[in-house]
Amino acid sequence: MLKQMKPSSRVRIVIVGAGMAGSKLANDLLQTPNTHHSITLIGEESQVGYNRIMLSSLLANDISDAEMPLVNTDKMRVGGVHIISGDPVIGMDLETKELRLASGQSVTYDQLIFATGSRAKILPIEGASAPNVMGFRTWQDVDVMTALKGCQSVCVIGGGLLGLEAAVGLVKRGHKVTVFHRSNWLLNRQLDAESAQLLQNRLEEMGVQFQLGESPSAFLQSKTGLVTHVVCQSGEHMPVDLVVMAAGISPEVRLAKEAGIDVNQAIVVDEKMKTSHPDIFALGECCEFEQQTFGLVAPIWTQIKVLITVLSGEDGCFVIEPTPTKLKVSGVNLFSVGKIQPSQDDDCIFFKDVAASHYRKLVVNDGLLVGVILYGNVADGSWYFQLIQNKTNVSDMLELLVFGEAYCRPKVA
């Protein structure tokens, strides 16, 4: 029999998902003055409110467990937030506004927020269901990787931000790591071929190996079910002890979809973060706005501010803005924002210092800076980003723009 939680006279806000988005929302709601909410935060993982961004630093042994919290859950509990961890929501009833948890208890809401995040995308490769094929999304994933003893052979699938951070962390722990990436260069969504080559050179110096332009065709398993070899497209069989999938994410939409809420790539929301159903909202990696999903922190933090404004009865509106990208690898400095692959109507400005491994590429359209790649010296990244955000006309400084703010010092609009 379901155990019913006690009702409250205040507006009952229930947040499904206790990752970064859900935990910060609960924490910031608690600190918002003149609000009359009771807040319940429900998480699938046993750890609540940790900084997922820092998982790669934890894996690389650059930080300790004590540096992982994003919010102070003890203070949140004292402040009245009811936190349920390790007990995922398995079903919901839109008419009764009731959630069913795996433990058997039920939670009733007045307003519901989906902050269910995403899961690692497991590619449809033969053998991918083996127990030593894993994602890199949770603290538990890091615990599995750090438990590897000796020098193990690890295959990382995906040369994006997450895959490269995982690869470097595993190399720092003494393992032999090979990264498979379908594109011909790393971080192909953030870098061009030339800057990516500089990055690859640096990562190879650190010990990471690469197989570019290909994905494994199969994983060979032993009688125990574990993957023992990666089959390359060339036919080569590469010995492996662990496979880490970092080839993208899949928004966690199962609960919303089963309830009949509009879902496309993710849970569809409007500018107020509201879903297709009254009193139900979504934010973070599980939501989709104007056919765009969100995997970086900056827009998600903006979504939290907008949603708190809306929940407080005021007018809030989420707008998509350019978001810069940085790689969290010690000793590697890169910055990317905006349009990096120019069209025929765009002008490109380059600066290269091969000896110092410095590279700059600026994309300009009709007097406006629209895209930036910096590798090596990234000190001007925030200034370039400000120029893009403010739509500052840079026509009168094009000759010196690539050298940075110190040479231009324009009046930012």
Which residues fall in each region the model found?
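Beta1-alpha1 glycine-rich phosphate/pyrophosphate-binding loop at the start
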Residues: 2-82, 169-190
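Mid-to-C-terminal Rossmann-like scaffold of FAD/NAD(P)H-dependent oxidoreductases
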Residues: 2-12, 18, 31, 286-382
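Short hydrophobic core segments
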Residues: 16, 107-119, 238-248, 304, ...
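Residue-level detector of alpha-helix initiation sites
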Residues: 20, 24, 46, 118-120, ...
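A Rossmann-like FAD-binding core segment of flavoenzymes
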Residues: 38, 77, 83-100, 107, ...
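Glycine-rich dinucleotide-binding loop and its adjacent helix/turn
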Residues: 116-173
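FAD-site-proximal beta/loop scaffold in flavoenzymes
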Residues: 129-150, 226-231, 236-309
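C-terminal catalytic lobe of FAD-dependent flavoproteins
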Residues: 236-260, 332-413
